[in-house]
C-alpha cells in the first residue's frame, strides 16, 4: 500500500521558460520541472521530486553493492588533513581540495574521495589474510572546488557519490573484487536505463595502474571518447593511446630551408606545400611543472592531450607567454626541433619516432624546414604519448578506424594496488607470517550525476521521460475538473485502487486549465498518465497515456487500475 501525493501540496515550482544559463538538456529540464534549484555556482538543492529519484538510484546502487558482497558504512565528510599528508595527496590535489582550520587551528579537508579515511580506518583492524577480502562503501555528499562549475549536476562543487574500497591479500583477489564491481556497475546502469559504455580511463589524482569508466553516451556530454565497432575497444580521450598514422613531409629527404612568409599556422604551411596537415609537425612551447622550458612536437593534424601532457611535464605545466618565447629565442608559428636554442628540452610524440622526413618550423621568422630527420638533424630528449586520439585513428587492438562520441562519466573503478597502504602503513600478515601492504581497489558511482545522465538520455521536446525504475512517481492521475463531485469520486476510486496495488501515484488536483496540467505533467515526465475528462467520464472511461511513446487509449473506469498495475509491474521487471 502506498500513499498518493497531491500536486496542490507538492513543492515542485515549474518554469515556463528555459533558464538562460542552462546549457545541457538535463540541467534545463531539471530546473524547469521544479526538481532542482541553484543556490550558488556548482551548488544545488534537490527538491522533493528529484530527491525521490535520487533515493531510487541510491537503492539500486545499494542492492547491487550488497549483492556483490560489499558492506555499507558511513565515514565523516570532514577529514583530518594529516591523513592527506600521509598519502601525499594534499598538495597534488590542488585548489579543488576544500581545506579549512577548526577553532583550534587544526587543518581539515572536505572529502572529495575517502581513500585516506578508509585506509586509516582499517589499518589497525585488518591485520591478517584471514580477514580479507573486505569491501566497504558509503553514499555521501562529496566536495570539489571546481574552477568552473557548469552543466548543472554534471560538474558541481557538492555532489552525491557512492564510493567503495576493497582490501585484498593478493592481486588475484583484487582482480576478483574489481570484476565484481565492474559487473555491479554494468547492472546499475542497466537498471537505471543509462546506456553506458565501459571505457579505459586515466586514474588521475586517485592513482593506480588500471581504471575503467562507465560513460553515459550523450551528444552534449562533457567527456570525449573513442571506440571500435569491430573489436569493442573503448577509451576516454585522456587514456586512449594508439600509433597515429603519419605522412612523411614534402621534399626529397634533404634538410631544406624554405621561406614561408607569414605562414605561422599548420593550415597555412600545409596549404603552401600542397600537403596534408598530417605531413607537418606541430611544435608547442611549454613551461613544465618545474618551471623549465620544453618544446613538444605532435603530428600537425592532432592536438596535445592535456592529461597525457601532465604525466610527462607535471601538473601545472603551461604554454609559454609571448615574453617567455622572446626570452628563450623562440618565434610563435615557426618553432621546430632543428637549431633549437640550448637548454630547451625536446619531447616528441611516439607516433613520429619512425618518421624520417619532417616539415617543421626553422626557429626563424618566416622560415620552415622540409626533410628534417630525427637523430640526423636534431636530438630528441624523450619520446612520449602526447596526442589526443581522434576518430579515424587506428584501433590499438585491431587496427580498424576508431569512432568518436561524447559521454558523461557516471562511474569509475580503479585498481589502486598498494599506493595508499604503503604510504599510510596499512599492512597485514600473510599465510607465511610476512608483513605486507594491503592491496586496494576503489569504486565510485556518481549518484547525482546518474540522475542528470538519465534525464540527458531520456527526454523529448515536451520534457523529461522518466524510466520507471527511477521516476519520482510511476503514475500521474489528472482529473480535469477536480471540483466536480463525479470527477472527484472517480479520481478517489482510481487513486485508492492504484495505491492498494503498491503503485506510486501523484494526483494533479490543482485548479488549473487542462492545457496547463498536460504541459506540466509532460514536463515532469511521469511514465503513465491517467486523464479524467468530462467526455470520457460520461462514457465510463478514462484516457491512459504512455509518456514514452505518446500512445493513448480509452480504458473503462473499472478496468483502469488493473491495466495500469499490469503495465507498471511489467515495466519494473
What are these regions (language model features)?
Residues 1-573:
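NTP/phosphate- and nucleic-acid-binding module
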Amino acid at each position: 500500500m502506498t500513499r498518493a501525493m497531491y500536486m496542490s501540496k507538492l513543492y515542485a515550482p515549474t518554469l515556463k521558460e528555459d533558464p538562460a544559463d542552462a546549457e545541457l538538456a538535463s540541467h534545463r529540464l531539471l530546473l524547469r520541472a521544479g526538481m532542482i534549484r541553484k543556490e550558488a555556482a556548482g551548488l544545488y538543492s534537490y527538491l522533493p521530486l528529484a530527491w525521490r529519484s535520487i533515493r531510487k538510484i541510491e537503492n539500486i546502487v545499494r542492492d547491487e553493492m550488497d549483492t556483490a558482497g560489499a558492506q555499507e558504512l558511513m565515514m565523516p565528510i570532514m577529514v583530518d588533513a594529516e591523513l592527506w599528508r600521509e598519502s601525499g595527496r594534499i598538495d597534488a590535489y590542488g585548489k579543488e581540495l576544500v581545506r579549512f582550520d577548526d577553532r583550534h587551528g587544526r587543518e581539515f579537508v572536505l572529502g572529495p574521495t575517502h581513500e585516506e579515511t578508509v585506509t586509516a580506518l582499517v589499518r589497525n583492524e585488518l591485520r591478517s589474510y584471514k580477514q580479507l577480502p573486505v569491501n566497504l562503501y558509503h553514499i555521501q555528499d562529496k566536495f570539489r572546488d571546481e574552477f568552473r562549475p557548469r552543466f548543472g549536476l554534471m560538474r558541481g562543487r557538492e555532489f552525491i557519490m557512492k564510493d567503495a574500497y576493497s582490501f585484498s591479500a593478493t592481486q588475484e583477489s583484487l582482480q576478483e573484487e574489481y570484476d565484481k564491481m565492474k559487473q555491479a556497475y554494468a547492472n546499475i546502469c542497466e537498471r537505471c536505463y543509462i546506456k553506458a559504455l565501459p571505457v579505459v580511463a586515466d586514474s588521475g589524482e586517485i592513482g593506480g595502474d588500471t581504471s575503467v569508466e562507465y560513460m553515459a553516451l550523450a551528444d552534449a556530454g562533457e567527456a570525449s571518447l573513442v571506440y571500435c565497432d569491430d573489436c569493442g575497444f573503448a577509451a576516454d580521450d585522456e587514456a586512449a593511446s594508439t600509433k597515429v598514422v603519419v605522412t612523411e613531409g614534402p621534399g626529397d629527404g634533404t634538410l631544406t630551408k624554405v621561406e614561408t612568409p607569414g605562414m605561422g599556422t599548420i593550415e597555412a604551411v600545409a596549404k603552401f606545400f600542397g600537403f596534408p596537415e598530417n605531413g607537418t609537425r606541430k611544435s608547442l612551447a611549454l613551461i613544465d611543472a618545474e618551471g623549465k622550458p620544453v618544446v613538444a612536437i605532435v603530428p600537425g593534424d592532432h592536438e596535445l592531450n592535456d592529461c597525457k601532457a601532465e604525466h610527462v611535464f607535471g601538473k601545472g605545466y603551461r604554454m609559454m607567454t609571448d615574453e617567455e618565447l622572446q626570452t628563450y629565442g623562440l618565434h610563435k608559428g615557426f618553432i621546430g626541433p632543428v637549431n633549437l636554442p640550448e637548454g630547451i628540452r625536446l619531447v616528441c610524440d611516439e607516433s613520429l619516432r619512425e618518421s624520417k622526413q619532417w616539415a617543421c618550423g626553422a626557429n626563424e621568422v618566416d622560415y620552415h624546414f622540409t626533410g628534417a630527420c630525427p637523430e640526423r638533424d636534431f636530438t630528441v630528449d624523450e619520446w612520449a604519448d602526447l596526442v589526443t586520439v581522434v576518430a579515424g585513428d587506428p584501433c590499438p587492438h585491431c587496427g580498424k578506424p576508431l569512432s568518436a562520441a561524447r559521454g558523461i562519466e557516471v562511474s569509475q573503478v580503479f585498481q589502486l594496488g598498494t599506493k595508499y597502504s604503503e604510504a599510510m602503513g596499512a599492512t597485514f600478515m600473510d599465510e607465511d607470517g610476512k608483513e605486507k601492504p594491503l592491496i586496494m581497489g576503489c569504486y565510485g558511482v556518481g549518484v547525482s550525476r546518474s540522475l542528470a545522465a538519465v534525464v540527458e538520455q531520456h527526454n523529448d521536446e515536451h520534457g523529461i521521460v522518466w524510466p520507471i525504475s527511477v521516476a519520482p512517481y510511476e503514475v500521474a492521475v489528472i482529473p480535469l475538473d477536480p471540483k466536480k463531485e463525479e470527477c472527484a469520486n472517480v479520481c478517489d476510486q482510481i487513486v485508492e485502487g492504484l495505491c492498494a496495488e503498491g503503485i506510486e501515484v501523484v494526483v494533479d488536483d490543482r485548479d488549473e486549465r487542462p492545457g496547463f496540467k498536460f504541459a506540466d505533467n509532460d514536463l515532469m515526465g511521469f511514465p503513465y498518465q491517467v486523464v479524467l475528462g468530462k467526455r470520457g467520464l460520461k462514457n465510463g472511461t478514462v484516457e491512459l497515456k504512455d509518456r514514452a511513446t505518446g500512445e493513448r487509449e480509452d480504458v473503462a473506469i473499472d478496468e483502469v487500475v488493473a491495466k495500469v498495475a499490469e503495465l507498471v509491474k511489467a515495466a519494473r521487471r
